[in-house]
Amino acid sequence: MGKGGMSQGEGSKVEEENMAAWLVGINTLKIQPFLLPSVGPHDVRVRMKAVGICGSDVHYLKTMRCADFVVKEPMVIGHECAGIIEEVGEEVKHLVVGDRVALEPGISCWRCNLCREGRYNLCPEMKFFATPPVHGSLANQVVHPADLCFKLPENVSLEEGAMCEPLSVGVHACRRAEVGPETNVLVMGAGPIGLVTMLAARAFSVPRIVIVDVDENRLAVAKQLGADEIVQVTTNLEDVGSEVEQIQKAMGSNIDVTFDCAGFNKTMSTALAATRCGGKVCLVGMGHGIMTVPLTPAAAREVDVVGVFRYKNTWPLCLEFLTSGKIDVKPLITHRFGFSQKEVEDAFETSARGSNAIKVMFNL
């Protein structure tokens, strides 16, 4: 696999025209030149056309960190992306100049035991777009391994291609939880990841889905996108007991799998209490690094807690879902911006405000 274009390199013939959005400090983004590495034999150079803003991007902007990842030097932001190939390496046979592609943003080592087991998303040497110190993809162009670029079918837009990244989180979560036609699903959180997890669950033939959030606007969107029931809750831990009853009533039967797409004390406590004996709670969101939750009662009911980190081998299935119409991600894109300094600043401010903004997309 090629080396990719995630760090500054030497000898790019397009360096004079390649600009990127650099995170240079708290709440400070600057569009500045980004020097690309040369295209290796297994790489492609891609002109970015659609790049989405992820919650992690906003975390980095507001705090210069996300979970244990800390930005110590200026970094190009962005990792949800699709574009058009402008140059291919000499060993690349399955892609040609002009192909529209969605990019899987993580390069693993392919040598460690985890990679050999197929769990490359857990590779300790992973180089992932916009995860410090690795640069991201909110740029005019990037260089990336061809094997991580997936050709878009004719009926899938570049914006939908960029949405394969967040959708992959939901698809991987559904695989980890082994949902199917006999699985009733509860989703905690109606933000972008909660919504794509809901859409993925439906594509996996889940018969009944209840989604929970504190925000009535996001719940309304969830209902429009196909949630069977929505439940508005509070942020108060004292309300867990009464809200669990409300959620279980809304489901109307056992809750087999709960996806916690927020990752807070309250949501995890609710998930553990609401899920049936012998069910699964899948931790998708990473809101709190450390949580205090009632694990002992959950253990006594043999509720399995399943971790989810990014994704693996999901792009082909995501594209299949989009092509077939099983999943429609277009309604999730609520705001669009160009790639000027002001538009970049406005886009991140819009995304940070939340509520009415689900997915903010750059059109380059």
Swiss-Prot record:
One GO process term, biological-process aspect: sorbitol metabolic process
Traits of the deletion mutant: Reduced dry weight and primary root length when grown in the presence of sorbitol. Increased resistance to dehydration under short-day conditions.
Chief place of localization: mitochondrion
Gene Ontology cellular-component annotations: cytoplasm; cytosol; mitochondrial membrane; plasma membrane; plasmodesma; plastid
Keyword Zinc included in the entry's annotation: yes
Keywords in alphabetical order: Cell membrane, Cytoplasm, Membrane, Metal-binding, Mitochondrion, NAD, Oxidoreductase, Zinc
Sequence positions that bind NAD(+): 193, 213, 218, 284-286, 308-310
Family listed: Belongs to the zinc-containing alcohol dehydrogenase family.
Protein name per Swiss-Prot or TrEMBL: Sorbitol dehydrogenase
